[in-house]
């Protein structure tokens, strides 16, 4: 097999746009252009790059299913058979006093609502007790070519493939028992579950305005799955395929082609190669509703409406801390509820 079959290539127009967004050109390109025009151009550039990334993934996926990619193994190091596990990761360690305020809040909520699951919290040191990655992965982490955010994409897949369970990002807030949610998500049908984009979502413009980098219902958009929350049985076909394809990517690349390249991979797999493995679609705006109200005045009735829809909530730690918590807001309510 020719090596270029599994190499990624960027959109040429996207590359030019990326250069123009750097010094010194950005002072002319960005600052002098009307904001609305600049935004439209960036959106178009993003869709062009998504298409280029999808085509690169297609070449790798085809080589993978034809048996032309190198077999790269990850080794589990524990026997956890029969145990229901919530997996979480925070690279620098889980000493509570050193965690960001939002992570502290989510930490306590997971402990409260774990139900019949046990929580295994991993960091850069103790993860080695559970999973062994190829040396090239660890080298890329050490030399900085793979950031911890994208390493965690690999870690979640490896753990779920080897042991099964539930992956929760450290910024996931729970307001109900996890076991109750796993039943409603229909995990038993496909053996895994992730929230996905739904064409029947209401208030699409609201969500696109809230986070235009992630939310879009444009037909060109290929970012349509949330990987912050993953339920999976051990040895699930989809999770295993995602893991092997991501390992193939990192074996041959040292730079991500798009922040959501994992999501683009999943979109290609379920759209073209493994449509029968697509899990139940549950709207990926649902885990974001609570955070969209985070700094608004707290309402018991509104909270009830939100938690009736989902008990799993995606928060963010960026720019959010007790220091800027607004009194009587939803954030203030949860800080007091969990004594953070």
Question: What does each model-identified segment do?
Answer:
Residues 153-163:
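Small-residue hinge/turn detector
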